[in-house]
């Protein structure tokens, strides 16, 4: 999936159209990443840019991270201060043509809407990649910000 590095975008679920958001618009380390209805104003906490493997939040300048660095299923996705590349295995991500966003160090683990819940404020977790219709809550699209 092609996108321009450094450009702001929403990370939108192919499952329910909600976007990745930082809970309560926090700018603090360890804030949970959730899905929420896309906003069109006051939306910096829903906007991201991609640089050198990091997804960086536009409001906080923190990056997508795995709580405690635990690369295992059901680990909570959070935002955290960016680490140096050699220490950032749990902060470096890629996205494939099917829309799976996966940890570069563990391509079998992807961003997942916990429990495939279809509502706001549901946590985003790391989970084993699934295929077919059951994988919709694990697939995303990067939607450029036009503001």
Swiss-Prot record:
Subcellular location: Secreted
Residue span(s) of domain Ricin B-type lectin: 4-143
Phenotype when the gene is knocked out: RNAi-mediated knockdown decreases cytotoxicity in vitro and decreases virulence in a mouse model of infection. RNAi-mediated knockdown has no effect on the germination or cell population growth of the fungus.
GO BP field: depurination; negative regulation of translation; symbiont-mediated perturbation of host translation
Cellular component aspect of the GO annotation: extracellular region
Induction summary: Repressed by hypoxic conditions.
Principal subcellular localisation of the protein: secreted
Enzyme class: hydrolase
Enzyme Commission designation: 3.2.2.22
Example GO molecular function: toxin activity
Keywords assigned by UniProt, alphabetized: Hydrolase, Protein synthesis inhibitor, Secreted, Toxin, Virulence
Reactions this protein catalyses: Endohydrolysis of the N-glycosidic bond at one specific adenosine on the 28S rRNA
Listed SMART domains: RICIN
Biotechnology usage: Antibodies against the toxin protects mice from mucormycosis and thus could potentially be used to treat the disease.
Reported function: N-glycosylase that inhibits protein synthesis in the host by depurinating ribosomal rRNA, and thus acts as a ribosomal inactivating protein (RIP). Promotes vascular permeability in the host and induces necrosis and apoptosis of host alveolar epithelial cells.
Family under the similarity heading: Belongs to the ribosome-inactivating protein family. Type 1 RIP subfamily.
Protein's UniProt name: Mucoricin
Organism: Rhizopus delemar (strain RA 99-880 / ATCC MYA-4621 / FGSC 9543 / NRRL 43880) (Mucormycosis agent)
Gene name, Swiss-Prot/TrEMBL: RLT1
């Amino acid at each position: 999936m092609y996108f321009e590095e450094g450009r702001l975008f929403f990370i939108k679920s192919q499952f329910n159209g909600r976007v990745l958001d930082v809970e309560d618009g926090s700018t603090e380390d360890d804030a949970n990443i959730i899905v929420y209805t896309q906003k069109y104003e006051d939306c910096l906490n829903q906007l991201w840019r991609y640089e050198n493997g990091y997804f960086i939040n536009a409001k906080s300048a923190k990056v997508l991270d795995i709580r405690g660095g635990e690369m295992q299923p059901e680990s909570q996705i959070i935002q955290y201060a960016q680490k140096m590349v050699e220490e950032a295995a749990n902060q470096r991500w890629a996205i494939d043509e099917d829309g799976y966003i996966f940890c570069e160090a563990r391509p079998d683990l992807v961003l997942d809407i916990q429990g495939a819940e279809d509502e706001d404020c549901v946590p985003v977790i790391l989970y084993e990649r699934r295929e077919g219709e059951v994988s919709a809550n694990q697939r995303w699209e990067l939607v450029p910000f036009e503001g």
